[in-house]
Amino acid sequence: NQKNGQASSTTGTIYGVYDMSGTVWERTAAYVANGNGNLRGQGASIAYNGNTLKTESTKYTTVYPFNEKDSEGNAITNIDTASQQNFVANSKIYGDAVRETNSGKAGTSEDGWNYSSWTSDYSSFPALGSPFFTRGGNLLNGSSAGVCAFDRNSGGSYYFGGFRAVLVNK
């Protein structure tokens, strides 16, 4: 029924955005520029210009700085620790709904999964072999899926991943 369908959009009309609660982890054009092989293997079209890793954001891609070293300058190999370090390294970045909707240190609970975004949405900052941002969550995340949820991803395909088309007005 079209009338009931319209009620589920953000505007209440057929022109609104549907399914803001998350049914898949939505891929984004955002990553930490840590040089991990998955950036080239899974995201060369957005992360590389020829053989050069893009380390600055563009009109269509958001690039985050990274800090995957411990206090002694050694490379961190634990993804949860690296996730926390990268979250801290990006503490001055606003406008992407990560800091604005997060009340804690993403990805830093004891088991590496954190629910510190608004309404206890899932939050884990990209790091190491999972340098890409995904948003939203899927049905397996239950009430932790939502508009404020974000996660790290390797860039590989999986059954609960998708994307959202975005129209850019020129």
Where do the model's predicted regions map?
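Short, well-ordered junction/capping motifs at the entry into regular secondary structure
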Residues: 1-21
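Eukaryotic nuclear/nucleolar intrinsically disordered, charge-dense low-complexity regions
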Residues: 39, 47-54
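Generic detector of bulky aromatic hydrophobic side chains
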Residues: 14-18, 36, 132-133
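C-terminal, surface-exposed recognition/capping segments
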Residues: 3-7, 24-33, 52-170
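A short, polar/charged loop-to-alpha-helix boundary motif
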Residues: 34-44
